[in-house]
Amino acid sequence: MKSTRPFHPTPVITIDGPTASGKGTVAALVAAHLGFHLLDSGALYRLAALASIRYQVEPNDADALAKLVDGLHITFREGCAQLDGVDVSDEIRAEAVGNRASAIAVHAPVRAALVARQRAFRKTPGLVADGRDMGTVIFPDAVLKVFLTASVEARAARRHKQLMQKGFSANMDNLLQDLRERDARDSNRAAAPLKPAADAKPLDTSALTIEQSVEQVLAWYRELGQPA
C-alpha cells in the first residue's frame, strides 16, 4: 500500500542508529543509488571533536565548544571531509576523535550550533542523512525514517575491521567497552538522546550483508510510491 503521507518538495531519508551499526555505509550506497545528496552527521561531530583537540578546548566547556563550532570551516568534497581546507577523512576516524565526539555531543549548545549546518544539506533532488537524531530532531518530516541496530559484538567486529583497514591499532575488548559506554551516553543524554522516531522502521543488520540492508531501505522507499 502506498503511503498518503504528504511529501516535502525535497525528500529526505534518515538512517539513524548507534555507533558501528552500518548506517554510514548503507546511507552512502542508498544516496548513490538514488542520486541524492549525502549527510554524514557523525563526520560533522568528529570534525568538531578534532578541532577541539587541535585547539585544546576542554570537552566539558560547552560554551567554548559551541563558539568553536560556529567558526569552523567545514566542507565535504568528493567524499572527503575537510577542516580548514585540509582533507582529514582518515584522521577523524581515529578512536580518540570518536570518543571526543561522543563526549561533546552531550552538550545542547554544541548540538544547536551544528543543527543549522545539517539542515542546509537538504537540496534537490533529495538527501540521505545518517546519524543519531536525523529522524527525531533534524528532519522530523523525512519521508522515510530507518533505525539501524546490530548486536554490540557485531558492531565491535565491524569497527575493528574498519580501523585495521585504515591503519589504526584497535583492541577488541576495548572496542566492546567503548561501544557500551557510548551507547549509554548517547541513549541517556538530555539533548536529543539516541532513540528511534515513533514512525521509524527498525532494521537489525547483525546478520545482514550491506547489500541486503541497502535493498531493504530501497524497498521501503519504493513502497512509498517513489522510483528507486
UniProtKB/Swiss-Prot annotation:
Q: What name does the UniProt record give this protein?
A: Cytidylate kinase
Q: Which UniProt keywords apply?
A: ATP-binding, Cytoplasm, Kinase, Nucleotide-binding, Transferase
Q: Which family does it belong to?
A: Belongs to the cytidylate kinase family. Type 1 subfamily.
Which top-level group of life is the source organism from?
Bacteria
List, alphabetically, the GO terms of the cellular component aspect: cytosol
This entry's Gene Ontology molecular function terms read:
ATP binding; CMP kinase activity; dCMP kinase activity
Intracellular or extracellular location(s): Cytoplasm
EC number(s) per entry: 2.7.4.25
Q: Where does ATP bind?
A: G17, P18, T19, A20, S21, G22, K23, G24, T25
Sequence intervals crossing the membrane: none
Please give the catalytic activity noted in the UniProt record: CMP + ATP = CDP + ADP; dCMP + ATP = dCDP + ADP
Q: Quote the InterPro entries the UniProt record gives.
A: Cytidylate_kin, Cytidylate_kinase_dom, P-loop_NTPase
Q: Does the keyword ATP-binding apply?
A: yes
Q: Name one Pfam family in it.
A: Cytidylate_kin
Name any Gene Ontology BP term. Answer: nucleobase-containing small molecule interconversion
Which species is the source of this protein? Burkholderia thailandensis (strain ATCC 700388 / DSM 13276 / CCUG 48851 / CIP 106301 / E264)
- Keyword ATP-binding in annotation: yes
